[in-house]
Curated annotation (Swiss-Prot):
Keyword list, A-Z: Cap snatching, Eukaryotic host gene expression shutoff by virus, Eukaryotic host transcription shutoff by virus, Host gene expression shutoff by virus, Host mitochondrion, Host nucleus, Host-virus interaction, Inhibition of host innate immune response by virus, Inhibition of host MAVS by virus, Inhibition of host RLR pathway by virus, Inhibition of host RNA polymerase II by virus, mRNA capping, mRNA processing, Viral immunoevasion, Viral transcription, Virion
Annotated site residues (Mammalian adaptation) in this chain: K627
Main location group: virion
Family the UniProt entry places it in: Belongs to the influenza viruses PB2 family.
GO biological process: 7-methylguanosine mRNA capping; cap snatching; DNA-templated transcription; symbiont-mediated suppression of host cytoplasmic pattern recognition receptor signaling pathway via inhibition of MAVS activity; symbiont-mediated suppression of host gene expression; symbiont-mediated suppression of host mRNA transcription via inhibition of RNA polymerase II activity; viral RNA genome replication
Protein name: Polymerase basic protein 2
Cited function: Plays an essential role in transcription initiation and cap-stealing mechanism, in which cellular capped pre-mRNAs are used to generate primers for viral transcription. Recognizes and binds the 7-methylguanosine-containing cap of the target pre-RNA which is subsequently cleaved after 10-13 nucleotides by the viral protein PA. Plays a role in the initiation of the viral genome replication and modulates the activity of the ribonucleoprotein (RNP) complex.
Source organism per UniProt: Influenza A virus (strain A/New Zealand:South Canterbury/35/2000 H1N1)
Quaternary assembly: Influenza RNA polymerase is composed of three subunits: PB1, PB2 and PA. Interacts (via N-terminus) with PB1 (via C-terminus). Interacts with nucleoprotein NP (via N-terminus). Interacts (via N-terminus) with host MAVS (via N-terminus); this interaction inhibits host innate immune response.
Keyword Lyase: no
Amino acid sequence: MERIKELRNLMSQSRTREILTKTTVDHMAIIKKYTSGRQEKNPSLRMKWMMAMKYPITADKRITEMIPERNEQGQTLWSKVNDAGSDRVMISPLAVTWWNRNGPVASTIHYPKIYKTYFEKVERLKHGTFGPVHFRNQVKIRRRVDINPGHADLSAKEAQDVIMEVVFPNEVGARILTSESQLTITKEKKEELQNCKISPLMVAYMLERELVRKTRFLPVAGGTSSVYIEVLHLTQGTCWEQMYTPGGEVKNDDVDQSLIIAARNIVRRAAVSADPLASLLEMCHSTQIGGTRMVDILRQNPTEEQAVDICKAAMGLRISSSFSFGGFTFKRTSGSSVKREEEVLTGNLQTLKLTVHEGYEEFTMVGKRATAILRKATRRLIQLIVSGRDEQSIVEAIVVAMVFSQEDCMIKAVRGDLNFVNRANQRLNPMHQLLRHFQKDAKVLFLNWGIEPIDNVMGMIGILPGMTPSTEMSMRGVRVSKMGVDEYSNAERVVVSIDRFLRVRDQRGNVLLSPEEVSETQGTEKLTITYSSSMMWEINGPESVLINTYQWIIRNWETVKIQWSQNPTMLYNKMEFEPFQSLVPKAIRGQYSGFVRTLFQQMRDVLGTFDTTQIIKLLPFAAAPPKQSRMQFSSLTVNVRGSGMRILVRGNSPVFNYNKTTKRLTVLGKDAGTLTEDPDEGTAGVESAVLRGFLILGKEDRRYGPALSINELSNLAKGEKANVLIGQGDVVLVMKRKRDSSILTDSQTATKRIRMAIN
């Protein structure tokens, strides 16, 4: 206090002020501080001081030939005095203005190409719409977000190779461009940048922006796609938000969004097939998103979402070490636990076998619309601090945390039996049983939980079983906070294993993800997703299954035909017929299958009854496990367009219509393809199929014994000849080929030769 008084006293004297403002600084320590080292100590002051001088800039002497001595206003642009200590000219800031207005103009053609990301940003902002500003508390949580719209998804190393190849093509150094995207981008950029005068370093920087995903860990309250993040400073403050609709979309956001939809569809579909893991891999490998293979996107794209991570785990890629439960991402921030099995009784006296985690642990829980901090001990919730966008989101988080705590009062709150099943009709595990039960109705759970008086803590408030806020009481251990809980920032990836049923575990055996955790939300993808796998035919409904099944048979008719005659069981078990079964009424599937298989067997036995159209039409029905019955059918029912429609065993119907003249098949009025051979040639089809591997020598030759049936042919040795009965009772002489290589041509020549031999 004394010192301050003394200073005030000094400052009141005019002499003090004069000394401090006018006298030179000549204290050695101060001079040293500001003059030692190359580093500028006060850059802004230095800049202001320099710019106040007449000629603060130096330039090469050649500039005097390019800039006049005075501008239009008669102001001097450069000094005739040389810069001390160098042979450069001293120049006025006015010279820069003159140069910008009157200097030489280079071609600007490359600017939009190089500064593509900036030009696109301007367009997005021009067409974007900003809505009203709302003042309200912003619950922001830090999330890892993409801050660079419009980029490809190359790794830093891949991008580096592309940049070197584009900008410095002649530099030495090992660059191997392997991925398809690398090659495409390199070719495209080399063409764009011919005769480009922009400095290579600048080009390299801009290319990096275009090729690599840049992420930051930022506090966000609203949308997290990159076109929202680029205007984060305009759309949300501490206590306000401004509505904004982006004026354009960017490929990287579309890829992320479409990848999530494709992954969810694939995981949901795989979960109900006989071998989920194999099916999932088959689908990932045969799917394209926006024309790029899904597996390539999975390798490069860092999106963390349950279904995406299951697909990555199946491909052997590393994923985040956090685990998922009830749609929330849990990350253990401290503590540890050991697992043991324990049997518990629900309020309905049903026995559940739980894997109990013993020990004290703390978790952060991050969901789409709510976040929380959870502290728990063995089967006991100690504290839960929740924040969320609305009451519904807060309820969801509380239910998940209460179930996760495994507390006895939660298990005793179960009313009725727990028998929830997944899509494949298998019972869910006990934790998911409990979760589904209380997600449907949490009333009893909240009432049974118990309440406690609370202390007044800043920013926290109590919540009662009926979800009303309170400052006096709250459900035991539960508080609602105004502040969000940050997402776990560590981007570490761990090695995981995945079992047949798509359960993903870390190296300690903890389950991180399972199909139960995959969201049921349906969305429309921004990019075209092309599922080539037959398992995904049903994604567009029953009609698509019907059309795709018949298209597949027609496309593969050559091989289908051979299998039909030689190895029907293998054909019936093909996975391409699996989706079709869901269209056939369950009660009659087996009878249909038995009937069609018997019909087919007769066709094989009684020559001349082979009918291509009929085989194609009825084949999918034969795939179900057959029931032997004496029933005959004149039509078979399929459930499409919301009702049963009939396929006639003999003849056309709206469902299956074959036009003999055009050889086109229409299914439900939609084109399903053309048959390359004429089904009217009666038996030609099966003959040529079975006679692959045999050479037709001519008419019957009695010396080679009685005519064999087509099925007996398989016993011939190579080079052996035999008469064979074909078609409408005609007999021809054949020889089994000595070489297998020419088998392919047989079926074409067979048809012609049979005709010649018979005529």
